[in-house]
């Protein structure tokens, strides 16, 4: 995947590969091909925040050459601290990928309801109260399992899978 503008804080890193964490995991790895020590954990935000709304401008759609809605995928970067209850997602700056041409872009949303450190488990608890507890418990179990299978370096700069 090519990110012509890079990511916020990493503008020089433009080439990535998107990897599955495990077949049943909600997480993906965005591994830099420019610097093998850099990888980010991604998740589909709709899995824990079904009302998440990303307004993409015509310019961004044009930049990514998105022709059909199904070609676009939205992901957010998450942080995975040692305690999974403190796992957060950057809902303020999602990534949009065009799976057809393998281009992507990180955008910054103007919506003040979204933060760079949105607590995932709190959102899952809200969802459990609103919907059925079975769905939320399954998501919590997947998140905890994926978290236990992952390891984050102390400085947060490197993420590796066991």
Set out the residue ranges of the language-model regions.
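Long, compositionally biased stretches
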Residues: 1-49, 69-148, 153
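Extended catalytic/binding region for NAD+/ADP-ribose chemistry, centered on the ART fold
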Residues: 51-56
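Short active-site loop/helix that positions an aromatic residue
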Residues: 58-68
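Long, low-complexity, intrinsically disordered segments
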Residues: 151-162
